[in-house]
Amino acid sequence: MEIIKDLPEVFEEFAEQRQKSFLMMKELKDKGTPVVGAYCTYFPKEIAMAMGASTVSLCSTSDETIPEAEKDLPKNLCPLIKSSYGFAKTDKCPFFYFSDVVVGETTCDGKKKMYEYMSEFKDVFVMELPNTQGPEALKLWKKEIIRFKEYLEKRFEVTITDEDVRKAVKIENEARKALKRLYEVMQHDPTPISGHDLFKVLYGSTFKLNRSEIAGEVNALVDKIEAEYASGKMLEKKPRILITGCPIGGATEKVIRAVEDNGGVVVTYENCTGAKSIDRLVDENAEDIYQAIAERYLAIGCSVMTPNPNRFDLMGRLIDEYQVDGVLEMTLQACHTYNVETRAIRKFVNEEKGIPYINVETDYSQADVGQLNTRIAAFIEML
């Protein structure tokens, strides 16, 4: 597969993938394809894919429906939860509307309670995610994955075979490998593309309803980026920033813009929509495929885990491999687990990796754009 279009046009196509998928969703439903929506990187999408379902990301990233959500939820709750619930309650999210079932998980307290309210108007299946990563937790998580499979079989009157699951694992692994290849173009110094363009592809790929298309499209994009870089097309050398913290997208892209409008370049994202979601593969050759899926997903380093060594391991590797000059952590207001973990992250970045760190706390409004630009510009100037 070869890309004929110019790179900016390709990046915009990925940026518009969410809107495109709105239209495709109705076509899928008309054909009778089941749709399974989810809110979290811990969602083992291969199980739903194995029965022929389309999987879609539901997390909302706009403050549009927060006032409606606050009629049921407290004002001092994380904006991601309020926005997600608001879009679901008002039927303003086509993905939620067309989902036959929504899969939740016991990550943070706010989400757990949100799923209770959401289940009043939608089929919601909540997976019991352990908040630790030891052997006993792994046993529980494997049982939950099998319970999810059995729920889908009963709900949709289908049989999900091990062979179906292995096929889905292979498709998703190929997508992860391709996205990781894309990620790695940012190891070049100077970078071939902006961090915002990288993010458009990463975020847009989460709304691809046909997961088997991702690998081919992204690999072709990487080939084009590398060819243009080899011919001398690249950005100027800039301070290299790693973004970590809460899920990023939509309204919070203001943080990426603040970095890149003020002389920096985002070379890597440790967040859920970034390296966390593509760093590990499922072992396709494992004798027990459900055990392999459980191991891969439980190893994700989220702040809901106690302790949370995998987040620090991944961040340390990213800092080294991407020659990071500074780490920017974005925490959402009232996200307790990420806010609490900022102290440990700051210490790790400053003392173990020996580079500067800044934490910015924000929400889904645009009211703090000026303040963000001021703080982030000062941070980049210091590097």
Which positions does each model-derived feature cover?
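Redox- and metal-dependent alpha/beta enzyme cores, enriched for Fe-S-associated oxidoreductases
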Residues: 47-61, 68-69, 246-307, 311-318
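A charged, amphipathic alpha-helical module
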Residues: 1-34, 146, 150-278, 308
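Proline-aspartate-enriched helix->loop->beta-strand connector
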Residues: 99, 319, 323-328
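Acidic/His-rich segments in extracytoplasmic proteins that coordinate ligands and/or metal ions
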Residues: 85-154
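A short, acidic, amphipathic alpha-helical segment used as a generic capping/interface helix at domain edges
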Residues: 88, 306-323, 341-344
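Peripheral docking tails and interdomain loops at the edges
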Residues: 3, 343-383
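Glycine/threonine-rich flexible loop motifs
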Residues: 113, 335-341
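An N-terminal, globular interaction/scaffold subdomain
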Residues: 35-89, 114
